[in-house]
């Protein structure tokens, strides 16, 4: 799948796309239509008549597991699994066995970058860019403006020349400038930091659209320094075509729908945000670098892809789960002592992850926990709460199973760790300041220490209005507001009605346990 328009054609042929010819506004209306359709499990949407825009826009392209499968197929998964298998067996592989994997070598020859003389993205150029004519969307009422929500931000390290392709939200400030939300632990932000120390502007190419694999590569949790375009090539099964920018220094992706090219000057910031984010609340307004746009290129008949984020599950939920499953074999190769990893899209991914380990000596579990939280590059180091357990036969995607396994084994005095004064995801506002906060580690390994109660029976604890079971051993309890009774938690902990339950959540509405997204 080498470009967006081929993918859109496939979706239409498969009955997975609806064209909307009626005039619509990019100011909240497209986003609301998108939200209603995705919540109903509906099709991808192609908005052909957007008020004030010269281009159509497509949303919900990846809003179901089936459409994700149509975008990428089985090849990437099969290729990576075979590659990892060879890497694991390499020391003992006989020449005959190695020869049996020759198909993989042929596939490997297709991986890489290829420079071409011309490309569709150069078909049209706007010498005097007017970003107001592009269908950037405003998705939530309190958003600070209109955003590129599927941006592919390409930069090169000012010293090494190594490239980075990342997805960092982009806000339109005016007709020729954009805000670049380089949050913590982002490769493009590291490039800008180096350029700024040299008092130099950083060249930047913002691509919109292109092969679907570009989007997946931009969000993949790759270690710093691993080139995203190589993953793109691997996913699509052919070399990524690049073309020289006749008016700039960076290469352009030949099959992109749009290339918005400019530079980010040093020591320049403008307010960016607020933005309704994937955690389900607004990230606030902060100062961020500014992209000064020099040129806008686009292919003929260009389509502007977009998405809408918010409380999960949204479109990024399906992409996030796919990339986790795809990268699982590589994770086991890089971290062989960790048998499995899963981050929970219901929480926005960074908030909650669990890993499966085998503890060979007391407290070894903490070594594995620090291995995850200390991951060099990638996004695992931003994990807020990590559950470490030895439930190898569990379905990691079912957090109830994981939590029951842990609660049967945990001693909270020795197995719950809260580490303060750490760097946090920029979008996490639970700490004392931006990028600051605490992390938690919960360990449940070894033989069971207790039998977990399954159903709550008996009178409600004093002051409680409702009790619901989330899983064996875990209750949600509706209690008084903290401002009304700040000591209620201490009172509840001494109530014999809950003495057999190892974990109780004191909440406003205990019925949230029925919905994993609301509860987690």
Predicted segment positions?
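Extended, highly charged
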Residues: 1-275, 280-290, 294-505, 511, ...
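Charged phosphotransfer/docking patches of two-component systems
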Residues: 513-515
